Amino acid sequence: MKCNRLENQVCVRTTGQYRLCCVSSEPDNVENIMTHDISKWTGSNARTNAIKLLTNNIWPDACTRCKVDEEAGIESTRQKSSHYGPGITHLDLRFGNACNLSCRMCWPGSSSSLVQEHQEFLMNDIISPWGESSFVVHNWYDDETALELASIPTLKEVYLTGGEPMMVKGLLKFIQLLDKNVSLRFNTNGTILNPTLLEEIKKFKNVNMCFSIDGVGKINDYIRWGSKWEDVYRNFKICKDAGFDVSIGPTVQILNELYMPELRQWASDEGVDIFENILSSPDYYSIKNAPWRNNNKRVHDDFIKYTNILDNKRNCFIADYLPEVANAYGIS
């Protein structure tokens, strides 16, 4: 068994920590891009041991996601990566957790805005949806590291997400260092589009902009709090007009499941692909626990509790944005 993604990609978390891949579930790795160059990671025990196990047809513990998918007959992340290689051809980078939005289903590890909100909850003795752990804002970008990454001779594709990649300090410098034959892929919330950066991105032959859009209009505004639909749609159109390969990647959850037909139709009308990501955590947002699907009182109570906490903090109320969902939970 072979995983080209594991062998031919370098994946870095928002903290700078190397990771086997974007869906792996290994414990914290000691190797961090701020203290270990790429060769230290590619030669690390965590990575080499995982490769050896797969070669012997043994699933590493960190690869449970792909194991479960393949046993269920679902194409796994491993199987989708056959075109990777030879050498390090792909980068999956999260330069930090800087983000201007406070998405309902997200967590402070991926959003600096949620770090602030979480801290405000704790300081005011209010129950936080993210527990009592402490979180910090990360930004591991520096010019030396950017040059090392951009100089990989076999590099074919760079995937940038976050946080919000358009907020990364130094992103323009990094983009300027890359060979223009490298494919660029962004996962963006669509609220920010720097004109200077846009002109630099236009120099690349292949650019994919995947907009994280969870609904049309005020549905998206509620779920991805801090966004304004008119801004997102304007930037969406700019990227389409620039000739980029534009798609949308909604996170399918209880908050938007009832409105997905509308979003699918919108994507079809706009002529873009839609890649639906099914949320698994937190469980009170998972569609398997929707009140129109089961009667799990504990999980439903959690949904109501955390919805009310965030609604009161943000002074926005679910009944005004997602009335069908509010009615299903008896929220008025």
Give residue spans per PLM region.
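A structural signal for well-ordered alpha-helical scaffolds and beta->alpha junctions
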Residues: 42-48, 60, 88, 92, ...
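Residue-level recognition of alpha-helix termini/interfacial anchor residues
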Residues: 77, 170, 258-259
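Short, basic/hydrophobic alpha-helical segments
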Residues: 143-150, 175-176, 236-241
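Conserved C-terminal portion of the radical SAM core fold
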Residues: 185, 204-210, 230-332
